[in-house]
Design a protein with these regions (language model features):
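A short, polar/charged loop-to-alpha-helix boundary motif
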Residues: 84-98
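Fungal secretory targeting signals
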Residues: 1-17
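Short, glycine-anchored, charge-dense loop/turn motifs used at functional sites
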Residues: 70-77
Length: 232
């Protein structure tokens, strides 16, 4: 029964009528914010994708990667990706926040110091955050939130998503204390969009030299890392 529901859910997503997600066009291409050149944004979004590939391989189905950046020292502090652990909250953003929390704790920082640190850091994610992660970003009080692919793009490509934009989450968080996080959307989408285009659309090419193979689990072809396929 559960399997039938999953299959029906996927079919419904692929066959759904077009829906425009309100306030999801926040294109900040070329924008200079907080003194950071746009070229630096592109550099760190590429590093976000690279962090994903290191942790999850060249074509993970859940291609969500995140890094946390200190622009003052020009360095990546922590990274994360979506992991299947059974914990439904471990999205890339939460994974990276957890990694930084553990790192800061090991450095001897107090809880108060850790809370204060988020306001000096920028979180980069290669796809727009779901409402849960966007809320976590605002609760943390990050200095900046920078994302690539939009929720609208992923909805159009058949992903099951919550159709609430980060913009609207942020609009409802204005009363939170602390830093009002700067949001920069749709950075380097020409490189992030392809990572999310192939999962439910067999006409889309595989990223990073992966190849399509039929998936018994999903009932259609998905992209596979050819170096991970055992030789016969």
């Amino acid at each position: 029964m559960l399997k039938s529901l999953i299959i029906l859910g996927g079919a419904a997503a692929l066959g759904a009528a077009h829906f425009t997600i309100p306030n999801d066009d926040q294109n900040m291409t070329g924008i200079v914010a907080n003194g950071v050149p746009y070229a630096k944004r592109v550099e760190y979004m590429r590093k976000t994708n690279e962090a994903l590939f290191r942790q999850s391989g060249p074509c993970p189905f859940a291609a969500y990667g995140t890094i946390i950046v200190n622009h003052t020292s020009d360095e990546v502090v922590c990274e994360g990706a979506n992991f299947r652990t059974g914990d439904p909250t471990i999205h890339g953003e939460i994974s990276a926040i957890n990694a930084c929390t553990a790192k800061f704790t090991e450095m001897g920082m107090t809880a108060t110091q850790i809370f204060a640190a988020w306001g000096q850091l920028s979180i980069y994610t290669n796809a727009e955050s779901c409402p849960m992660c966007a809320s976590a970003i605002r609760w943390a009080g990050f200095k900046e939130y920078v994302y690539g692919t939009t929720i609208q793009h992923n909805y159009n490509k058949g992903w099951g998503v919550m159709t609430l934009s980060s913009y609207d989450v942020f609009q409802q968080s204005r009363q939170l204390p602390g830093y009002q996080t700067v949001m920069l959307g749709q950075i380097l989408t020409n490189e992030t969009d392809p990572l999310f285009s192939w999962q439910y659309d067999e006409s889309e090419p595989c990223p990073n030299s992966c190849v399509r193979q039929f998936s018994q689990t999903r009932g259609y072809s998905t992209c596979t890392n050819i170096t991970a396929i055992p030789s016969m």
